[in-house]
């Protein structure tokens, strides 16, 4: 209570690694993708049960992977990826679906946007703080509606939004808070 001059410092995204890439997949319609830990608390069935056109991809690993692979054989589970391989795979998506109801901030949202991929999520803390309707994605209590609306969002708009969260921008913001101009 005796603190003064407090300023938030945003998390950043590596916009050199996570950036738009050439499409190397030729799927059947749009690709809806989740990336992250494959665990119960991520609420993945809320995404995987959706009736969506095209394909569903899950990038990642975790304790629920085996069960979900058996339950959803039509879903493409890539397994864990990292670095360039992760960034290229993510950039193939047409929409990034974030079904979690409990994450306070998902860096994966920024990574998707930096890749030019709009986000579909529930309007809960975390996504609500960073997703702007029609600018970089869509929020809705009906995740299917959010995903379908996100398909119409400009990839360039997502990229422009994410550029404000590059590590360069976040570092300058942090340094300016330490030593104001």
Provide a role label for each language-model segment.
Residues 1-21:
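Donor nucleotide-sugar binding/catalytic pocket of nucleotide-sugar-dependent glycosyltransferases
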Residues 20-57:
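Conserved donor-binding/catalytic core segment of Leloir-type glycosyltransferases
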Residues 65-84:
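Nucleotide-activated donor-binding/catalytic signature segment of Leloir-type glycosyltransferases, i.e.
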Residues 80-81, 88-93, 174:
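Short alpha-helical donor nucleotide-sugar binding micro-motif in glycosyltransferases
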Residues 101:
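Aromatic "clamp/platform" in nucleotide-sugar-dependent glycosyltransferases that forms part
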Residues 118-121:
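Short hydrophobic beta-strand element within catalytic cores of glycosyltransferases
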Residues 151-180:
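A charged, aromatic-enriched C-terminal amphipathic alpha-helix characteristic of glycosyltransferases
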């Amino acid at each position: 209570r005796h603190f003064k001059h407090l300023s938030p410092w945003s998390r950043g995204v590596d916009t050199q690694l996570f950036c738009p890439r050439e499409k190397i997949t030729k799927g059947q319609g749009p690709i809806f993708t989740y990336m992250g830990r494959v665990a119960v608390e991520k609420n993945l069935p809320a995404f995987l049960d959706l009736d969506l056109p095209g394909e569903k991809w899950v990038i990642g690993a975790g304790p629920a992977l085996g069960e979900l692979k058996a339950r959803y054989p039509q879903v493409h589970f890539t397994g864990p990826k990292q670095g360039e391989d992760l960034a290229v795979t993510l950039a193939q998506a047409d929409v990034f679906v974030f079904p979690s109801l409990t994450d306070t901030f998902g860096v994966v949202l920024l990574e998707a946007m930096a890749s030019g991929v709009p986000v579909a999520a529930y309007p809960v803390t975390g996504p609500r703080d960073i997703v702007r309707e029609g600018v970089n994605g869509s929020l809705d209590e009906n995740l299917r509606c959010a995903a379908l609306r996100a398909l119409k969002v400009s990839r360039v708009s997502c990229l422009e939004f994410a550029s404000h969260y590059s590590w360069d921008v976040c570092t300058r913001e942090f340094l300016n808070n330490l030593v104001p101009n």
